[in-house]
Amino acid sequence: GGDFDIYRGDAFQLVVAQPQHSIAAAVGLRLALKAHASGVDVRMSVAVGEAQFRPSEVKTGTGDAFVLSGRGLDNIKPHHLTFCSGEQTLDDKTQLLTRFADSHINGLTQTQSQTLLAYLEATDKSHESVAAILDKNRSNVSRILNASNYKLIAEYLDYMERALILWVQGGTSLKTEQLTKED
């Protein structure tokens, strides 16, 4: 869940209640826009930190999250997605990964964006299930997902979620071992 404000007709601010879901929300929103129409995209600066706001007036919010997000937006070009926590250790481990993910998402087609979004949102991640959701055949969905490098994006989102869970828990010195996924 979250709160949002739209202003100036072409800008918005979104507050995600659980910081660990902020990157997934941003990537999902980007994919949804790219899936909606060819050539449509958005620039987003994701930041986590303290925030004070009234739910009906997100645009008047204050705190680290708003300041960091604003700074990120000021410096976002030529990128479309940035991330900042204000914690050097976390930022060192996540900003480069975010730029790679951003670069990859930039190159996705409308169909790849639609299919990748359906995969990421699906409870059942099987290609058959995603194909049923999209009313496409499984082999076509598999081909599109592979071309969109879906596993890499899913792994990036998992990594960011784990990193932000540790951040929320007060992990000020994040270690690589803490962020490595255990199979």
Q: What residue spans do the PLM features occupy?
A:
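DNA major-groove recognition helix of helix-turn-helix
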Residues: 145, 152
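Flexible coil/turn residues that form the inter-helical turn or adjacent wing/linker of helix-turn-helix
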Residues: 122-123
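DNA-contacting interfaces and partner/effector-binding or oligomerization modules
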Residues: 1-70, 74
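Short alpha-helical "packing" element that flanks the helix-turn-helix/winged-helix DNA-binding module
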Residues: 114-119
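Short, Lys/Arg-enriched anionic-surface-contact patches
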Residues: 93-111, 164-167
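Short alpha-helical "recognition helix" segments of helix-turn-helix
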Residues: 126-135, 141
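Flexible, glycine/charge-rich interdomain/linker segments that couple
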Residues: 53-60, 76-99
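Intrinsically disordered, low-complexity basic tails/linkers immediately adjacent to helix-turn-helix/homeobox/MYB/SANT
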Residues: 154, 158-183
